[in-house]
Amino acid sequence: VVVEDRPMPTLLESTDAVIKLAASCICGSDLWPYRGAQPVDHQQMGHEYIGEVIEVGDDVKTVKPGDFVVGSFCISCGECATCQDGYPSRCLKAIAAGDGFIGMRSNGTQAEYARIPFADGTLVKTPAYPTAEQIPHLMAASDVLGTGWYAADAAKAGPGKTIAVVGDGAVGLGAVIGAKQLGAEKIIMMSRNPKRQELAKQFGATHVVEERGEEGIAKVLELTDGVGAHGVVEAVGTQQAFDQALGCVRHGGYIGFVGVPHDSSIGTDVLFGKQVHLEGGPAPVRKYLPTLIDLIYKGEIEPGKVFDLVLPIDEAPKGYEAMDQRTATKVLLTM
């Protein structure tokens, strides 16, 4: 990872906006190319962002220069059939334009400025300019909180339900917040990291399971009267994590999987036998942003606590190293 000067992003389409970032961050998924597991060639990194709009195209109607905005890592028009169905992360217009994700046709957002395609369908204006304390919380909403919330929603978190979370990274911790806010009665965090266990408890976890594999599954079954969790969040993306999620869920239960898959497969025979409901993929964060922003401004959630290392963007390589070595849960980059 290197930090270098690049040309200032410009409007490419009449539906674009250019923003000046207030902060960015490093995502767990950024570690896959960092570790060589995903081929890249001088790719400008970053897909999480908040900041001030400085320029908009002629067809942008919902945001204007001077507005502070939060956006999703997936681009969405807000109008196509897929967006209307509640899955803006798979926007038909954005994919057709080559702009399905931040950074595909323009710079990534680990940068001072960024072009945001389909601004009307991607960006959400905040009710007021944020305080310094609110910046990390809004930054988390851009991806990890929204992704975790989606996973908890897909796992059908709700009153009287038990939700297990596999993965104690920022997304898994965001899922704990989501499960709590959606009303889950029992939230089981599967984690061996004492610092992350404590944060999970602050966010609403009622139980912590340190065991993994079959031992971890047995512990979750013990906590659920031998039946299993109503829903499980899988927030890692490995075979071991998915197998653990499948073992922890009850018959007829739900798995919300948002860990980016790497060399993993789904045992359809087990899915069939347990009658498991399965939903996952790139999170439709844009759908949840108005709710998340409202909760943050009301002070009801503090997702920015996942950031345990703050660095200026010039020191981004140190942040990658810290997350790779798991000495940091999530790194906030300041401009």
Predicted regions and their residues:
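Glycine-centered, small-residue-biased loops immediately flanking beta-strands
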Residues: 253
